[in-house]
Amino acid sequence: MKPIKRKSKKETDPKVLFRRSKEWATFRQRMKKKQKYDYVTGSPLAKGFNLHHLCEDPKQYSDISDESRFVCLNSTSHVVIHYLWGDGKRRYNWKERLQKLKELCELMDEFNDN
């Protein structure tokens, strides 16, 4: 008897499946043409940019009817946003984390300003 092969999360996760859809690919490219730049840094969008959902509600994940709920981010900006805000399962104290990063940058300024 063959063992039962379980489907991986990538094969069953509705978010992953939606991001593989033609509808998402078309929407993503349309948003890239409109926004052109990383929302955080202002840098031109890289090939592997992320179209970030501002609404983390899983029930609304595939609702692309309101373009204002999405921003284009390059990968580093996307990682930083999720580091500060959370990952959809957990929410962090982003204001505290952002304050700590600001303090760190100010310290670096002190050590590096001539």
Residue ranges of model-derived segments:
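Histidine-centered nuclease catalytic patch
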Residues: V40-C72, I81, W85, R91-Y92
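Short, flexible, mixed-charge glycine/proline-rich loop motifs
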Residues: E23-Q35, D63-E67
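Conserved SAM-binding loop
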Residues: K34, V80-I81
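A boundary/linker detector
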Residues: M1-T26, R30, G42-L45, K89-N114
